[in-house]
Regions:
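Start-transfer (signal-anchor) and selected internal transmembrane alpha helices
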Residues: 1-22, 123
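Membrane-interface alpha helices of multi-pass inner-membrane proteins
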Residues: 177-202
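Extracytoplasmic loop-helix module adjacent to an early transmembrane segment
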Residues: 22-69, 81-82
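Transmembrane-helix motifs of polytopic, lipid-linked glycan transferases
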Residues: 97-121, 125, 163
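Membrane-interface transmembrane helices that cradle and orient dolichyl/undecaprenyl
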Residues: 161-178, 213-216
Length: 229
């Protein structure tokens, strides 16, 4: 019991160190480039006269509809960016640091779920290694994790993708989960043109595997794929 408590304390310390360091980096990362465009209802790629701030859900939807027509359909990522651009930067710093922490924890959790649980005693070490790998190998971490416009499109959508995958891999779920897994799949599918199609394909293959190996097809999973597409 004592050994278990010590591991939990070390685990929490690793998480605290990571979230603190990422918060500090977020704190010193300023607004730049696209951030200023997403402060307002989107009309065109560059700021112009008579810009209108996003003041309501209707404004946000209008902005994203314009964005879809003019630029691209990254509804999820740019909605996240526009929401945070209406508040003090510190609000984003706190949430973004937590989301980066969630990315590492999800990768750790999925790796054990997919491969094996027998090495759980080394979980703290694995988690620390995961964050070191993320630090060294994430492409342009300043643009994909710290910059608001980049983080909303890459970090946040990656977490949604992994969360959806984790839900799919779980068995014996409550039928009521569909109330939140379908919206989750929708927002994951509306992430970006790189990871969204890849995860839709991956989860479609998982559904196909279940259909062949276990002679069953989950209706909720099929509905999730439809929502994501």
């Amino acid at each position: 019991m004592k050994e278990k408590n010590n591991k939990e304390i070390v685990y929490l310390l690793v998480c605290l160190v990571v979230v603190t360091l990422i918060y500090l980096l977020n704190h010193f990362t300023l607004y730049t480039s696209d951030d200023f465009v997403y402060r307002f209802i989107y009309k065109e790629p560059f700021p112009s006269d008579n810009e209108q701030p996003v003041r309501s859900l209707f404004d946000l939807i209008t902005s994203q509809m314009n964005h879809w027509k003019v630029w691209n359909g990254r509804f999820t990522g740019h909605s996240i960016v526009q929401i945070f651009m209406q508040y003090n930067k510190e609000v984003f710093n706190v949430f973004n640091s937590s989301v980066f922490l969630s990315l590492g924890i999800l990768i750790d959790s999925l790796s054990f779920e997919i491969v094996s649980n027998k090495h759980r005693k080394h979980q703290v070490l694995y988690l620390a290694i995961i964050f070191l790998i993320l630090w060294w190998f994430l492409p342009e971490i300043g643009k994909t994790v710290l910059w608001i416009s980049g983080s909303g499109n890459y970090l946040w959508t990656a977490v949604l993708d992994l969360l959806w995958l984790k839900v799919v891999l779980r068995r014996n779920q409550s039928p009521y989960n569909i109330l939140w897994t379908i919206p989750l799949a929708f927002f994951s599918g509306a992430g970006n043109e790189n990871t969204s199609p890849a995860f839709i394909l991956l989860i479609s293959l998982i559904i196909l595997y279940d259909a062949v190996s276990e002679k069953r097809v989950s209706v909720s999973r099929v509905l999730e794929i439809v929502a994501a597409c």
